[in-house]
C-alpha cells in the first residue's frame, strides 16, 4: 500500500502510471522527486493528501500483470529501452516540430513577443537535448555498461553527476516554456498552428519528464 511517507520518485518507479497522477496535481516526480508524498502535497495548494493517496492506491490495485516495468531490466537492457522509447522519438519529434515553432514565432511573434521568447527557449532546449542524448549514446552509456560488467570506470560518479546536472537544466527550460504558454493553454485567438505547437510541446514535456525520471531514479541507481 502506498502511504504518505513514500518517496514520490520511488512510487513512479514502482508504478509508472503514477506519473500521470502526480503530473495532474503539479507534483514534480522527476528532478524534484526525492521527497515524500506528504511533503510534496504540502508544497502545492488545493492538493488533498488523502484523495491523492486514494488515487495512487487505485493504480496499485489495478496495475496490469505482466506489463513491462523498466526497473527490472539490467543496465544494458534499460539503456536500449531508453534509447528506443525516448532518444529516437525525441529526435524525430524535434525534426518534425521545429518548423511549426519557427512559423509560429515568425507569424505571430511581432504581436505576441512571448512567442519569440518561446522559440528561443525551445531552441535552447532542443539543441541541449540533442547534444545530451548524443553524448549519452556515444560516451556515457557505454561507460555505464562497462561498469555493470565489472570493468573499472574511474569517473563513473562524475559521469552521473554531470548527467543529473544536465537534467536539472533541462527541467528549468521546461518550466520556462510552460510559464510562457500558461501551461500550454492557447489563447482564444490561437490559430491551428498555434494550438498544434502548444499540444505537441506539452506532449514533449511529458515525454522528457518520463525520460529523465527513468535515468535519474532507475538507471543511475543501478550503477551508483
Curated annotation (Swiss-Prot):
Per its UniProt record, what Gene3D superfamilies does this chain match?
nmb1532 protein domain like, SP0561-like
Location(s) in or outside the cell: Cytoplasm
Query: GO MF annotations for this entry?
Result: metal ion binding
Biological process, per Gene Ontology:
protein repair; response to nitrosative stress; response to oxidative stress
Keyword annotations: Cytoplasm, Iron, Metal-binding, Stress response
| Listed GO CC annotations | cytoplasm
SS bond list: none
Q: Which domain of life is it from?
A: Bacteria
Task: Identify the Pfam families for this entry.
Answer: Hemerythrin, ScdA_N
Q: Which family does it belong to?
A: Belongs to the RIC family. ScdA subfamily.
The free-text function statement in the UniProt record for this protein reads:
Di-iron-containing protein involved in the repair of iron-sulfur clusters damaged by oxidative and nitrosative stress conditions.
PANTHER family attached to this UniProt entry = IRON-SULFUR CLUSTER REPAIR PROTEIN YTFE
Q: How does it assemble?
A: Homodimer.
The protein's name = Iron-sulfur cluster repair protein ScdA
Amino acid at each position: 500500500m502506498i502511504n504518505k511517507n513514500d518517496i514520490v520518485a520511488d512510487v513512479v518507479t514502482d508504478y509508472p502510471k503514477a506519473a500521470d497522477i502526480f503530473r495532474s496535481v503539479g507534483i514534480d516526480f522527476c528532478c524534484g522527486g526525492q521527497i515524500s508524498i506528504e511533503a510534496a502535497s504540502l508544497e502545492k495548494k488545493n492538493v488533498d493528501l488523502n484523495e491523492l493517496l486514494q488515487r495512487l492506491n487505485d493504480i496499485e490495485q489495478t496495475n496490469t500483470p505482466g506489463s513491462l516495468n523498466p526497473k527490472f531490466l539490467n543496465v544494458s537492457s534499460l539503456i536500449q529501452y531508453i534509447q528506443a522509447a525516448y532518444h529516437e522519438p525525441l529526435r524525430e519529434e524535434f525534426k518534425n516540430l521545429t518548423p511549426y515553432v519557427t512559423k509560429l514565432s515568425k507569424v505571430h511573434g511581432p504581436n505576441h513577443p512571448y512567442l519569440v521568447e518561446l522559440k528561443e527557449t525551445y531552441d535552447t532546449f532542443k539543441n541541449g537535448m540533442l547534444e545530451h542524448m548524443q553524448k549519452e549514446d556515444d560516451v556515457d552509456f557505454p561507460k555505464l555498461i562497462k561498469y555493470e560488467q565489472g570493468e573499472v570506470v574511474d569517473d563513473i560518479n562524475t559521469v552521473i553527476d554531470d548527467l543529473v546536472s544536465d537534467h536539472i537544466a533541462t527541467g528549468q527550460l521546461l518550466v520556462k516554456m510552460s510559464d510562457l504558454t500558461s501551461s500550454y493553454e492557447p489563447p482564444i485567438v490561437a490559430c491551428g498552428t498555434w494550438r498544434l505547437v502548444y499540444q505537441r510541446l506539452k506532449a514533449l514535456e511529458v515525454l522528457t519528464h518520463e525520460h529523465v525520471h527513468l535515468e535519474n531514479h532507475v538507471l543511475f541507481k543501478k550503477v551508483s
